[in-house]
Amino acid sequence: MAGSGWGLPRLDGFILTERLGSGTYATVYKAYAKKATREVVAIKCVAKKSLNKASVENLLTEIEILKGIRHPHIVQLKDFQWDNDNIYLIMEFCAGGDLSRFIHTRRILPEKVARVFMQQLASALQFLHERNISHLDLKPQNILLSSLEKPHLKLADFGFAQHMSPWDEKHVLRGSPLYMAPEMVCRRQYDARVDLWSVGVILYEALFGQPPFASRSFSELEEKIRSNRVIELPLRPQLSLDCRDLLQRLLERDPSHRISFQDFFAHPWVDLEHMPSGESLAQATALVVEAVKKDQEGDAAAALSLYCKALDFFVPALHYEVDAQRKEAIKAKVGQYVSRAEELKAIVSSSNQALLRQGTTGQELLREMARDKPRLLAALEVASAAMAKEEEAGKEQDALDLYQHSLGELLLLLAAEAPGRRRELLHTEVQNLMARAEYLKEQIKIRESHWEAESLDKEGLSESVRSSCTLQ
């Protein structure tokens, strides 16, 4: 091995080409392996003379953590070498640049795109959390993209990372101020939950175009960090309720009120359950077996629900599958299940309309008994608006939002209602509305899977999947 001299560094076994970027103590180059494979890699070149004690510790931590982990959404450390002048980290090459550039060239990301990226980032963080590793410098510049064509996120730059149990506390200031949790600045005392705040800032920037503490000066930034004001979300662009809920819970200034790691990983907007994986096909197949059984028993509603849940796993299974022949086989099966779902949808839709007509008398009586309860009457009016909205084509999400708003009120009123006929009617109405909302939610999940359904779009199936799993 030889040092860099005045040109590009030289490293045995590799040809270094263009410079990709540079940081405080390292420069990253694109390189090719001299082997027959001509593998493309990124080489992080750290000049020994630039290292102080803290940067040596950071570098050793990065090597220690990365050499022991393998995950599809974490940049892989392939090897490391050194000579008299430099230390070289030979890394997986990510051709798509970083997430910061990706966001800013598009100004903002659609919610559906941000959701897929967040799912991938959450998967990487779950993997690290299970090993008590905290990144401590999460920001878009440290999140790389595998390519610009169907990019996958790759978490990088573990220089500040630490082995931290959830109850461990640190006092050393680490990270970038725009993405740094308030407790790191205000208290100089923090734990693993700072990564959750940073995730919230990244998501906020992806959806709104800039971080919540974007400032023109450092003093303005410090004032915003030290403020006690609640982080307010812009009204535009319009986001789903689940997305706004997650953002607000991530961006809690007080870490004791911030969403927990387990609740973050389980959050419905993150939806780790439906990430493309080697298990996706097996999960889809198991649900289809249950669907066929219910279908044979004549339970059309249960069968349709199970077919739709199965399709929720077939879409990521198609994304995960790389073998063309197996992909075609999966596609053929999906076509069969879509056809059967279409038939079941007609049966269930007809049945639901009949049930709604049957329930009209009870609903009208409940409204009569709610005349002296303006709050109850208002909540029932919202429920009626939800039912009307559900009848409009393409308004399923609006209907679900109204159902959820109505149920939020009705459940509180039900808990406070005294025993009697009105309570019985209210209980029945709540059960009916919850069933409608839950069923509608299942159908919307397929419609919301934009990127996951992209492969199906090309194969002409996604519209069939979406329409089959949505009752009109």
From Swiss-Prot:
Q: Which residues form the active site?
A: 137
Homology family: Belongs to the protein kinase superfamily. Ser/Thr protein kinase family. APG1/unc-51/ULK1 subfamily.
How this chain assembles, per its entry, is:
Interacts (via protein kinase domain) with SUFU.
Q: Might you name a Gene Ontology BP term for this protein?
A: protein autophosphorylation
Name of the protein this chain belongs to = Serine/threonine-protein kinase ULK3
**Keyword flag Aminoacyl-tRNA synthetase:** no
Question: What species was this sequence derived from?
Answer: Rattus norvegicus (Rat)
The record's subcellular location field reads: Cytoplasm
Which InterPro entries does the entry mention?
Atg1-like, Kinase-like_dom_sf, MIT_dom, MIT_dom_sf, Prot_kinase_dom, Protein_kinase_ATP_BS, Ser/Thr_kinase_AS
Gene for this chain? Ulk3
Q: What are the GO cellular component annotations?
A: autophagosome; cytoplasm; cytosol; phagophore assembly site; phagophore assembly site membrane
